[in-house]
C-alpha cells in the first residue's frame, strides 16, 4: 500500500452543520460544468462554483436538510436541485439562469439572490438518504428516499399540466419497502438481466435488492402529508431480497455503505455495470460483481480505520472507476479493480465526504475529493489523478520503450543484465559527468 500526496486544494467557507448525505456534486445550472451543493441543518443550501471560497448562490428551505441531490427528477430534460428535510419537506430549485449575461459572462440574475423553491411538497418525515435514478428500467428517473425507521420509499414526478417549462405536477408514491436494518446507502447497479436494480445497504456488510413491482399502467396516490396508507404502499417481504456477503460476520450490527454501477471501461459508460462495492465502519472493504446465480467476491480489504463514506471515481482516466472510502480521521483509500490500494491523508477530522467531477479550475470538470471539516472549512482537492495505480520503477517503464533497448545495444549493454542497467541509470541520473 503506497501513499500519495495531493497538493492542488481550495478552501471553501462553510459555517453550518450538516448531515452526511447533505452534500453532492452535480450540474445545477445545466452548463455542463459541475457545482458543489451543501445543505445545512438551518435549511440553507449553498452552491459553490469554480474556486470561489464563498457560495455562488444560496437557497432557502424549510426544516433541517438531511439530503440534497442534482438530477432530472421531473424528466423534463434538465437538472433540478433537490433538497429534502428531516421534517419531510421536499424542495425543487430550478437554477438554470436566464440567457442574459453580464459583461463578465456570468448570469446576472442569480448571483447574490437567495433562491426560493419552484416547488415544495410534504412527504413522510425522518428522511435520511436520497437517490435520483431510473430504478425500474423505463427510461424515466424516480426519487428514492431512505428513512431512519428502516423504510425506503419510491416516488415519481407526475405532470398535471402541458407546459414544458413550468412545474405543474407533484410527487406520487410508487412503493414502500420495510427493511430489517438501518439504511445508510441507496444505489443502483446493473442486474444479471441487464436491467437496473435498486440496492440498499444493510448492517453487517450486507445489502438488499428492492424489487420494483408496481404496475406502470395504473395511477398512483399522491405523496401527501402524513401517513400514506393503501394497498399500493403495503410493504411486502417478498419484494426485499437480502444478501449476506460473508459467512463470517464479525459485527452484524456494524454500519454499512455501498455504491453500485462501478464502470469497467469507456465502453460501459452507457450500458452500466454489475460491479458494486461495500464498506463498513469497522474497516472492511469489498468489491463484488452481481451474477445470475450468486454474487462473486472480487476482493476484500481490511483496514484499521472507521470508514463512514464510500464513493467511486476514475482517477487514472482509463474508464475504470476506482473505489474511494473515507474515514473520520481523514484517511482516504483508493482501490482499483485489481485490489491495488493507494491511500491519502487529510490532516483533519472529517464530518462529511463526497467525490466526483467538479469544475474547480480551467473551466472543465476534473476528478475531485471533497472534505467537510469541523473548522468551518470545505477542502476540495481537484485534479485528483494518478498515472497508474500500481507501484512501478524506472527500469520497468523504460523497458516498455523500444528506443531504450536500441540505446543499450549501442552502448554494448545487455538489457537483461539488471545490475549493469541499474548502475548505468544511476550514473546517468546522479553522476552524468
From Swiss-Prot:
Segments traversing the membrane: none
Classification via Gene3D superfamilies: Integrin alpha, N-terminal
Annotated localization: Lysosome membrane
Annotated Gene Ontology cellular component terms: KICSTOR complex; lysosomal membrane
Biological processes, Gene Ontology terms: cellular response to amino acid starvation; cellular response to glucose starvation; negative regulation of TORC1 signaling
Physiological role: As part of the KICSTOR complex functions in the amino acid-sensing branch of the TORC1 signaling pathway. Recruits, in an amino acid-independent manner, the GATOR1 complex to the lysosomal membranes and allows its interaction with GATOR2 and the RAG GTPases. Functions upstream of the RAG GTPases and is required to negatively regulate mTORC1 signaling in absence of amino acids. In absence of the KICSTOR complex mTORC1 is constitutively localized to the lysosome and activated. The KICSTOR complex is also probably involved in the regulation of mTORC1 by glucose.
Protein's recorded name: KICSTOR complex protein ITFG2
Species in which this protein is naturally found: Pongo abelii
